[in-house]
Amino acid sequence: MAQDMTYARYLALDELLSAQKPLSDRHDELLFIVIHQTKELWLKEILHEVALALKLIAGGDVEPAYKALARVSRIQTVMTLSWDILATMTPADYLSFRDDLGTSSGFQSHQFRALEYLLGLKDQSFLKFHTERPEALAMLKSALESPSLYDVAIAQLPRHGLTVPDAALHRDFSQTYVPSPEVEAAWLEVYRDPKRYWELYQLAEKLVDLDDALVTWRHKHVLTVERIIGGRPGTGGTDGVGYLASTLRRRAFPELWSLRTKL
């Protein structure tokens, strides 16, 4: 009953605070665990908000989705700032327990990959890293095969009298989105007449906020990893900083960036 509820019970603090299980006796390992567990909690909330935004936009309720999208970008800012905390760990601190991590890596975060899928950055090759976790794999497959945030945003363009090719509206959503000159032209009309298309204009800018924040997070990730391990390979088998740096050019909403050159 509500009158019996306590702060600790409501937040399941006993379970939450016992979930940090360092494998070594090194002081800094707890920070490493807390940073990554906190990231996963924030990703859970981000996925919750993106799911709401997807539902609202797909149903034509674009303006109510702004709040969810704004909340996501605020959370992204907090996640980016958290790299500064991890950066207090020196190379010696990290190397003192790195071997205990084995092949575990943030590269294997299914929630981060689900977020990429829901934004429109689809890549089926990541599914193979989650075959031993059926629930995580099912979540990823659902996100992969469903329309992304960008797909439902593009679908709003014809509802406002803008021309979009059928191939952009009815496609295999599990495949990587290929930028379209026609889609860019439609968004360009929105940006050239924001008063007329205010709802779409605001939606587009909210999406760019998300993309901007994601790239900023990636960039800070690269710098933090380089500061701590330099050019060493990542624990997950990637080439570490080299792989992370290669992701900096990714854009979830490509035409919303490219159109700016033509304004």
UniProtKB/Swiss-Prot annotation:
The keyword Metal-binding is annotated on this UniProt entry: yes
Cofactor note: Binds 1 heme group per subunit.
Residues reported to bind substrate: F32, I33, V34, I35, H36, Y94, R98, T235
Cystine pairs: none
Record field: transmembrane: none
UniProt-listed Gene3D superfamilies: 1.20.58.480
Coiled-coil zones: none
Domain of life: Bacteria
Protein name: Tryptophan 2,3-dioxygenase
Organism: Caulobacter vibrioides (strain ATCC 19089 / CIP 103742 / CB 15)
Lineage: Bacteria, Pseudomonadati, Pseudomonadota, Alphaproteobacteria, Caulobacterales
